[in-house]
Amino acid sequence: MGETTGERALTRLHSMRERIGDSLSAHTNELVAVFSRLVNQGKGMLQPHQIIAEYNAAIPEGEREKLKDSALEDVLRGAQEAIVIPPWIALAIRPRPGVWEYLRINVSQLGVEELSVPEYLQFKEQLVDGSTQNNFVLELDFEPFNASFPRPSLSKSIGNGVQFLNRHLSSKLFHDKESMYPLLNFLRAHNYKGMTMMLNDRIRSLDALQGALRKAEKHLAGITADTPYSEFHHRFQELGLEKGWGDCAQRVRETIHLLLDLLEAPEPSALEKFLGTIPMVFNVVILSPHGYFAQANVLGYPDTGGQVVYILDQVRAMENEMLLRIKQQGLNITPRILIVTRLLPDAHGTTCGQRLEKVLGTEHTHILRVPFRTENGTVRKWISRFEVWPYLETYTDDVAHEISGELQATPDLIIGNYSDGNLVACLLAHKLGVTHCTIAHALEKTKYPNSDLYWKKFEDHYHFSCQFTADLIAMNHADFIITSTFQEIAGNKETVGQYESHMAFTMPGLYRVVHGIDVFDPKFNIVSPGADMSIYFPFTESQKRLTSLHLEIEELLFSDVENTEHKFVLKDKKKPIIFSMARLDHVKNLTGLVELYGRNPRLQELVNLVVVCGDHGKESKDKEEQAEFKKMFNLIEQYNLNGHIRWISAQMNRVRNGELYRYICDMRGAFVQPALYEAFGLTVIEAMTCGLPTFATAYGGPAEIIVHGVSGYHIDPYQNDKASALLVEFFEKCQEDPNHWIKISQGGLQRIEEKYTWKLYSERLMTLSGVYGFWKYVTNLDRRETRRYLEMLYALKYRKMATTVPLAIEGEASTK
């Protein structure tokens, strides 16, 4: 798990062991005091906050000052978990993001030893099976396949994969004239449905290419910058140059200059810019099978939330960028984007039963729905995202057939979303030999603590054996991985990233992951999305405000009627509102928000609470949602919150939701996102884009989106009293100084403009697709060895596990 090679990792681990050994002689009493307290906890696993609590309890504050910067403090503060099996304590230590070390301490004998990853995982497994049997266990290790592959070594390089890749491979590939031939071949291979682009058969060598480019340059010097390509098309064909260089003389000249500069003195940023200007992506397929995927009346249905919004906004921005690039390249090609999702015959008033649906606000983007099927025919009912695994292989074959018919071509890029979409994208890209991009949105392993170690307890309901295996396969197969934040990859100083948690873990009785993913891998790229600016815009833009919706919004918030759309009534309708909107599930933690509000009488004096989640009109079939529904009612009754809270059913009208955010801005309220973990935080972006001061979880993406105290606030969902105190402090300060609310509102808007817009996103995604497509063509970046290993894992492990997931019983009611 070292930073570069196994040898360096061992050196570092050994030095850590020596430092602990030195501390034993220098601070024996303190070490004994701390580790004895840990061992006295008995067999089990301790989390970081528990380890630090025991350290603080064992060592008086004055003595702790003397231990600052000691090996003991470094180890305890860097420990992400402690496995206690008396008299042993094993520690997983994380000196910095992406770098791990493992130690085991015998508290009776005060002995310290380093552990390899398999040794640590084997020790950890004793918490489950209680034995130390050395029976052969399947170990998954992807590191040998990447041993000769370039990777950065600094944590700050994580998520900037394309820059590193260009830098490294440019120097390796373009070191002399002969090494430039792959670039020539790449340009010669460019075509679309039989139409030759960039170069024709007249150019067969680098000398011929450079000669043609210089002649073209000379020709362009004699015509005006705005001369259309069509006017010198025939001359260029004679030189061996085809369409794709640009739509006018000026743009063609710029592209030719870029290539000439590359041929003479390769430079990474110039290479990236050149690859971003040439035609490469015309047909894109986006996979998102689960849930109810449609453009209206679905948000709030089970498994249907931010991912749907993300993809619909994504494709609008992508189509605009593709059309712009194709025009600038001087081509007359119609791009196509297909969002492939599941067709639901039991569509419940949505368009989910419609095979093909055009995406509003686009010209060439459609939702293509393909049903799940078994040997008994089409599956009609909605299926939880945790139960889709038996259907996906057949689904992939059906999707391949459908997209071939729709596109009449092979896609240039396949993008997967979430675990099921990523697995289908992986199988499809593998089958078609297409560039494959993965977007996780959320990796469930990080949302459910210890769901790997105790996977058997979760298996009947969640089937994590299938899901975690699918995640491993997809992330290792992908040509590039897009994340919204650094946190998603490698967390921060205190918390472990989603992908980082897949570096090493164990599922006792199934397999042991010795090296699952490398967060330093240059396939990782941070590309942050935004909000749809036509819907979400600042509350201060009065000319765009949808004031015609205010009566509806006031009815929603303040009417004294309780019905299937809203429960409970607000007494004081003048108070500011704390607002939250999310799916009603355990991880989104809206019940936690209600509880922290209920436990703080001062907060109730200052503000009302409005939560939007669930559906009062229909009983959910989702077990987790049912449990949270019941818990919400119990909390409202327990804390006597009627009069202070409004519980509104999930709202599917995004346009009205945008004005709802702005209406709450008018009331000088705030948005709170209290999730136990949030991969990104699209509602955080939406609220901030409207100018609503935002308080969001410190766990996951929002910690990166928000600069604490400047553009919003971080809250710890595990420390309700501190979170509610922060809210009280904010609203009291706003009462004293109304400009404080404005200051935080403007700070949020500025943050969005700088980093979180769909235009920036689409430009970056198209460039990444071109760059990785190029490197895949000219090098061994397609990682054939890894993919053969993945085929074996899929065939021998995943397929068998998928058969254990029960198929849907069609006779049951299929409602949400």
Curated annotation (Swiss-Prot):
Keywords: Glycosyltransferase, Transferase. NCBIfam families: sucr_synth (TIGR02470). It comes from the Eukaryota. GO terms for biological process: sucrose metabolic process. Its EC number is 2.4.1.13. Residues 280-757 are annotated as: GT-B glycosyltransferase. It comes from Oryza sativa subsp. japonica. This is Sucrose synthase 3. GO terms for molecular function: sucrose synthase activity. InterPro entries: Glyco_trans_1, Sucrose_synth_GT-B1, Sucrose_synthase_pln/cyn, SUS_EPBD, SUS_N.
